[in-house]
Amino acid sequence: MDAVTVYHGKISRETGEKLLLATGLDGSYLLRDSESVPGVYCLCVLYQGYIYTYRVSQTETGSWSAETAPGVHKRFFRKVKNLISAFQKPDQGIVTPLQYPVEKSSGRGPQAPTGRRDSDICLNAP
C-alpha cells in the first residue's frame, strides 16, 4: 500500500477532510486507514464541499474492492492502483470521478490544470 502515492496511512478522518477541503477541487481524493475497522481503508473524495468516504478492502484471495452506491455491481481489482484508475471514469458508483490525487509524499495538494506543461517553463540562469 505504501507504493500508492495517495495513501496517507493512519491519519484521522478529520485530518483527511482538512487535506481535501484545502484543495477546493471537486474530485480531489486520498486513501487512509479506517479508524473503526482494522485492515480496511477509506477512499475519501471531495465533492461540492462535502467529503464522501468509501471503504476499500482486500479479500482473502488478494483482490481489492470498494463499497459503492447501492445497486452498483461490486468489482474486484488485482491492485489498488487499478481500483483507483477505474474510479477515475464517470458512473462507477461514487459521487464524482477521482480527478486530483492528494499525495502524501509531496506535501502538496493536487494542482489544477493550468494549460501549461513543464516544458513550457524556462528558467534563466544568471
From Swiss-Prot:
Sites bearing N6-acetyllysine, chain numbering: 89
Coiled coil start-end: none
Effect of residue 90 to K: No effect on interaction with FYN SH3 domain
UniProt entry keywords in alphabetical sequence: Acetylation, Adaptive immunity, Cytoplasm, Immunity, Innate immunity, SH2 domain
Region (Interaction with FYN SH3 domain): 67-92
Pfam families: SH2
Tissues where the protein occurs: T-cells.
Gene3D superfamilies: SH2 domain
Residue span, SH2 domain: 6-104
GO molecular function: protein-macromolecule adaptor activity
CDD domains tied to this protein: SH2_SAP1a (cd10400)
SMART domains the record matches: SH2
Region annotation (Disordered) ranges: 100-126
Protein's cellular compartments: Cytoplasm
Domain of life of the source: Eukaryota
GO CC terms: cytoplasm
Example GO BP: humoral immune response
Function: Cytoplasmic adapter regulating receptors of the signaling lymphocytic activation molecule (SLAM) family such as SLAMF1, CD244, LY9, CD84, SLAMF6 and SLAMF7. In SLAM signaling seems to cooperate with SH2D1B/EAT-2. Initially it has been proposed that association with SLAMF1 prevents SLAMF1 binding to inhibitory effectors including INPP5D/SHIP1 and PTPN11/SHP-2. However, by simultaneous interactions, recruits FYN which subsequently phosphorylates and activates SLAMF1. Positively regulates CD244/2B4- and CD84-mediated natural killer (NK) cell functions.
Subunit structure: Interacts with CD84, CD244, LY9, SLAMF1 and FYN. Interacts with NTRK1, NTRK2 and NTRK3.
Name under which the protein is recorded: SH2 domain-containing protein 1A
